[in-house]
Amino acid sequence: SIPLEWKQQTPLVSVIMTVYNAAATVRSAIDSVLDQTYRNIELLVIDDCSSDDSLAVLKAKAADDDRVRVLQTARNSGTYYAKNVGLSFARGAFVTFHDSDDVSSLNRLELQAQALASDTNAIGNYTRYQRLSEKGREIWLNGGSNRPGYITLMVRREAAIEAVGYFDSVRVSADAEYVERLRTATGREVRLLPVVAYYALQAEGSLTTAGAGAFVVDDQGRAKMPPVREQYREAARRWHEKIFDGESSAVLPFPLSERPFFAPEEIRPEKRGRIESE
């Protein structure tokens, strides 16, 4: 049960959702955030230059609920660039993330926020997630039906930005890099909570099923990491070693003007545009 004093003093949680051509799914994603048992939230939705009706859907949601704030990028730059836009506008003591084609358990934010508030040794936490087919069936990968979900990462906003700055603005794999950078730079825990609280829809065209960064899944449900992700992960690991040894700063500014480590050309963002706010 949640103590009375916790209910009376709940910190503001900023939820950052990036959107690109997700008009068909973003309503349910937004509703799963707004319907959370944890009520003290702001939802920042960042449209990454969608060509469908996503922006109109977002504006309609914002008109119905003043907890929703709509931001726009003027040029498509990828989900982690858009997440950084959200981070730069966020006001919450805690900040977390949500994709535009997924849904959360209705108590996800309450579970994570309470765990983080009561765990002074942790700078963040995340939950497990279940990947589902478009028909709602569980998808098994590498022998498991659920996996650690970095998309659910919740951090102490000011402490995290002071320690490591922002996400690397590449198009894939920057969430795992961010978590490991937090651990390396701060020596504090980013805890995996042993609960499935997030459900990801496996749709065609997602980051994990399309493009250079796509995972290849065989008939037995075994997923193989693509070369560009392996190259990026190894380059990030070497950079983290330098951070640990005190040879490099862990802070990535936003926007990023000079890379501290290698990223394959295929996953780098295009030229960045201005930011517009509703």
Question: What residues fall within each predicted segment?
Answer:
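Nucleotide-sugar donor-binding/catalytic module of glycosyltransferases
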Residues: 1-277
